[in-house]
Amino acid sequence: MFEKLINQIKELSTIDFKEATEKIRKYIDEISEEDFNEIVKQIGTIPENIEHDSTEEKLYSKASDIVLARCFRLLGLASRALDERADSADILAESISGYKYSLVADAKCFRLSRTAKNQKDFKVSNLSDWRGSENEYAVLVAPYFQYPQSTSQIYSKALENNVCLLSWEHISILLEKM
């Protein structure tokens, strides 16, 4: 199923970005939960056949936002990927039960070939700023293998700014338990 998503992204990369985004949103929202869960397990890694700094890569990133928004919906939140691209959160989610809270989230994807990560790649402080006064929480989701294995500014920034760090693997496990 992941390969089908990649093929969709490649095919749609030649049309208007907004139109391509809507088609990808429709595709992701309509696939079965079983197929969707397979995508969740792989979405954190950008395939090398997606061109660097290309429309394909931007669409892949947008697809990851749409995937995370659907994950939050499956976990019981009202959620959507936002259209804004620069200097704002990618996803907004709100509780729909008795608890009234909202969160902003950022979905991160990296290439396996990417080894030099630094805290700027994760934008933890920015995510906290994007939360603003109207959202209680901020969540960053990235591939587990891309988080540093020892002390890092990423962790201290997350603690300082009250940003929850999750991995795509954590999200996948939560979805399996539903």
Language-model regions: role of each:
Residues M1-L59:
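Interdomain/boundary linker segments immediately adjacent to catalytic/signaling cores
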Residues A69-I91:
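A short acidic/basic microdomain associated with nuclease active sites
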Residues D83, C109, V141-F145:
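Structural motif
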Residues I154-M178:
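Charged, structured surface patches that assemble and position nucleic-acid processing machinery
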